[in-house]
């Protein structure tokens, strides 16, 4: 079993490296194939050993081998998180068909986190790709009842759209469409829980930032990472969280 976990971790960090490329290039409308990976500062094309996920960053001490400019920590961090999420997905779900939903689900969240942190943008191309993928997957591996996906998508979109109107643009269009996509994968209860958790985590982060004077009340904070955390917790722990809440209020 250790080798299986190791396999998912290695596959995860490899895909994590690719997701970094997708999250950084697609918002700029650049090809994810050409040009090949290079230093954004000096243009140095990376050798194969400079592309090894996580380890190349450590071996190069976080700097470009050519110009010595520091490499963004987002690369190894997101690679590591992807590897851990792939392992955790298998740990929670095992070799079942739902794993084919879980892995794309966490993949979407990694990509939009990279994109939102880097540009405060969640591209439509990414959302459309994963929406089509989830429609196909949920047709084969449906929620119960099957129409829960449609309800989750509709409620996710409307809920965020209303908040965007009430907050006068406080919620971006990418966040609205993202919740619609997540709603299709999660269903009604899942998307509502994801919304609650992401809002709670985002609010606590903002409050902490204001208390420590790292943020002001007018600071623009990308909401994508908080959506990702809330969605992951909802996807893997929906039943446990609702059970805990019911026990709490009874």
Q: What does each model-identified segment do?
A:
Residues 1-14, 90-91, 135-141, 230-250:
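Hydrophobic alpha-helical transmembrane segments
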Residues 8, 99-100, 104-204, 244-250:
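Functional transmembrane core segments of multi-pass inner-membrane proteins
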Residues 17-74, 223:
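Membrane-proximal soluble regions of multi-pass membrane proteins
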Residues 19, 23, 85, 89, ...:
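Alpha-helical membrane-inserting segments
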Residues 20-26, 61-69, 109-119, 161-170, ...:
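C-terminal ends of transmembrane helices
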Residues 25-33, 91-95, 117, 142-143, ...:
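Transmembrane helix-loop junctions in multipass membrane proteins, especially transporters and channels
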Residues 58-98:
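Short microdomains enriched in Cys/His and/or Lys/Arg
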Residues 211-233:
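Interfacial loop-to-transmembrane junctions
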């Amino acid at each position: 079993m250790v080798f299986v976990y190791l396999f998912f971790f290695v596959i995860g960090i490899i895909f994590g490296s690719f997701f970094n490329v997708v999250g950084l290039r697609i918002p700029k409308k650049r090809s994810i194939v050409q040009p090949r990976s290079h230093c954004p500062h000096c243009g140095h094309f990376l050798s194969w050993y400079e592309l090894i996920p996580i380890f190349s960053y450590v071996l190069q001490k976080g700097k470009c081998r050519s110009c010595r400019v520091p490499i963004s920590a987002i690369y190894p961090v997101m690679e590591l998180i992807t590897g851990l999420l792939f392992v955790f997905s298998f740990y929670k779900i095992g070799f079942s068909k739902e794993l084919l939903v879980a892995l794309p689900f966490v993949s979407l969240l990694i990509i939009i986190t990279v994109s939102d942190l880097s540009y405060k943008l969640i591209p439509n191309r990414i959302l459309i790709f994963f929406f089509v993928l989830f429609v196909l997957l949920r047709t084969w591996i449906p929620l119960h009842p099957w129409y829960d996906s449609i309800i989750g998508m509709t409620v996710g979109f409307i809920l965020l759209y209303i908040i965007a109107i009430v907050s006068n643009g406080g919620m971006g269009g990418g966040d609205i469409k993202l919740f619609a996509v997540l709603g299709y994968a999660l269903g009604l209860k899942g998307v509502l829980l994801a919304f609650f958790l992401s809002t709670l985590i985002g609010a606590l982060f903002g409050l902490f930032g204001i208390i420590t004077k790292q943020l002001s009340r007018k600071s623009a904070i990308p909401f994508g990472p908080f959506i990702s955390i809330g969605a992951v917790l909802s996807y893997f722990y929906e039943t446990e969280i609702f059970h805990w809440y019911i026990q709490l209020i009874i």
